[in-house]
Amino acid sequence: MLRIFPIAAPTSFTSDFNEGRSGGRLHAGNDLFAERGAPLVAVDDGQVRSGRDPLGGNILNLYANDGTRYYYAHLDAFADGTATLIDPPAPRMARAGEIVGFLGNTGNAKTTVPHVHFEIHPGNGPAIDPVPALQSAPRMSDPRVMLAGTASQRNVLVTVSAVTLLSLGAWALLYPNDAQALIRRLGV
């Protein structure tokens, strides 16, 4: 179901779908934990719409071409580097593996450790348990992902040193503009 795992960094998670939350609500997704600022990537090709929500803080919705909506919440910043939105930007297209934001703890998560709340809504309907899809999703370090680009991108992968692959991740080779944005954000 997911073409790529939503975080391009070491991540931990457990199944917390449908667990009780404050105000009598149920947890409609899963919390994925990683370092603050870890790159969040599009799990499929589709349209990205970012915004702000009292519970989710900085949020984005990815509307995949098959009608599935993927919801990401508590972002530290969006891919364009903005941390807050006064006027939501126009929707934009993203490819699977492209950076769409950075992990944080905004909204009602400001007193928690950094994480992304992630939901899957097939047909833009009710949320389903994302754990099975997350467990089977390829990670950025997976050879299937690293070889998924065009012939010229695959040639670059073959010639790049292992150190570069480990330090920047395979997505940096497939999405060099995103890699440069991350480098600017990290100040390296």
Give residue spans per PLM region.
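Acidic, glycine-rich catalytic/binding loops that coordinate metals and/or anionic ligands
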Residues: 1-12, 33, 68, 81-98, ...
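Short, solvent-exposed coil/turn segments
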Residues: 6-7, 25-27, 35, 55, ...
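A structural signal for short beta-strand/turn segments enriched in small hydrophobics and glycine
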Residues: 13, 40-42, 46-48, 89-106
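Residue-level detector of conserved, well-ordered beta-strand and adjacent loop positions
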Residues: 14, 33, 63, 73-76, ...
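A generic structural motif
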Residues: 17, 36, 52, 76-79, ...
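Zn2+-dependent peptidoglycan hydrolase active-site motif and core
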Residues: 42-89, 109-119
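Short hydrophobic alpha-helical membrane-entry/anchor segments
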Residues: 155-159, 167-186
